[in-house]
Every structure is written in C-alpha cells, then in structure tokens.
C-alpha cells in the first residue's frame, strides 16, 4: 500500500543514513529525542484541550439561543481568519503583559484555541448529518435535549467525525513546528540548534523531515485503525 511504501521507505532511509553515515546523521538523531518529546507533549495537550473546546463550539453553533450561537460563530470566524503564527505571537505577548506564562503553556493555549475552532466545525457538521428523527424519537421517550445529544446523537456522529478529526490531529502535529518561534525546544528548534553549531543544515533538516514523516504516518495509521474498528462494531 501507499502507507507501507511511505513508512518503510522512510524508516529504511533513516536506518541506512545512521548505519552508513553515522557522522553526522546518527549524531543528529541522538540530539533530537528531547525535542521529539516536547513535540508530543505540545500535540497531546493541545488535542486534549481542543477536543472539548471544539465540542462546546459545535454545540454552541447548533444552539437555539441566539447569543450562544452568535458567540460560537464569531469565535470560529475570527480564529479561522487568522494565521496560526499570528495567533501564537498574539497569545504569547498578550498573556505576557499580564501573567508570567511559560513558553510551552502559551504555545499549547494558542494551538488549542486555533484547532478548537476547526474542531467546532467538524463537530457541527457531524451532528447535523444525523437524522433529525433521532432527536425527536429520543425526546418522545422522555430524554432531555442534553441527554439525547450525549447518549444518542454524538455516539452515532463519532463515526462521521473521526476521519476529519484525525486529519486535524495530523495537521496539529505538523503545526507544532511553529512553536519553535516561542523558544519552545521542540524537534525543529533542537534541529536548528544543532545546525547552527555544526553548519550541517542539509543533513539536519533531512533527519527532521524523516522524523516528522514517520510520526505523522504512524498517527494516520492509528486513526485509520480506529475508524475501521468503529465501522466493524457499527456493522455488527
């Protein structure tokens, strides 16, 4: 498959570079693990915050309350209209005027706010794709609107929501490369530090590209497996 060719090709390239040209490729690889851990931490924390924020936003856009609907819609329009890089700078310096916020925390907040808006649209579309008769049937059985949403609608919508949510996770992982501008020592910043000391820019960024490719391919495979599992249980 295309995934297997891409993943094993990248993995074989990484191994060959480290075995046949350990200086500098193996040295670069040894220098990067701390940055890889930070990249994972930023990604996971941002996912954990953006998912509930996206759900709240999606429900807000579907709310019958005009004020809540307006607030949720405005949040989505404003955030989607600004580049992530601008949001990172704005959150970092705006919070810095009032609070002493660590670089990594500011990066996570900015990533969560940005992707919360995109997730909100995904949740809204997923919920709207479910037949409205489901809501009416549940309400006729005595469920409240909130119970119906969480016990009936969302479990069905999750199958539809998962693929685009997975794509957002992958995009978020790649966008963590931008947090290096806030002095967060992610994998890209660690690579830049090594390149600045050794002047091996081509070799360093080759390794960074391979590492990002391997991580994103693993994440996409995980999402694909979850999707197949959900479809299997739904069909049986």
Each PLM stretch: what is its role?
Residues 1-236:
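Transmembrane alpha-helices and adjacent helix-loop boundaries
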């Amino acid at each position: 498959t295309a995934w297997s060719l891409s993943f094993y090709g990248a993995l074989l390239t990484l191994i060959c570079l480290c075995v046949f040209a350990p200086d500098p490729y193996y040295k670069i690889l040894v220098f990067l693990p701390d940055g890889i851990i930070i990249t994972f931490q930023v990604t996971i924390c941002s996912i954990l915050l953006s998912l509930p924020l996206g759900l709240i936003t999606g429900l807000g856009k579907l709310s019958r309350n005009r004020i809540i609907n307006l607030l949720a819609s405005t949040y989505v329009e404003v955030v989607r209209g600004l580049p992530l890089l601008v949001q990172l700078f704005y959150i970092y310096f705006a919070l810095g005027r009032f609070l002493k916020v660590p670089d990594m925390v500011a990066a996570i907040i900015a990533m969560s706010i940005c992707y919360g808006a995109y997730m909100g649209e995904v949740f809204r579309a997923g919920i709207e794709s479910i037949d409205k008769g489901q809501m009416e049937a549940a309400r006729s059985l005595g469920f409240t609107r909130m119970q119906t949403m969480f016990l009936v609608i969302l479990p069905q919508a999750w199958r539809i929501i998962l693929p685009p949510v997975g794509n957002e996770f992958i995009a978020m992982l790649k966008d963590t490369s931008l947090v290096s501008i806030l002095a967060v020592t992610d994998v890209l910043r660690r690579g830049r530090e090594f390149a600045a000391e050794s002047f091996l820019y081509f070799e360093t960024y080759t390794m960074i590209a391979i590492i990002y490719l391997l991580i994103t391919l693993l994440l996409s495979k995980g999402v694909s497996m979850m999707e197949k599992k959900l479809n299997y249980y739904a069909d049986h």
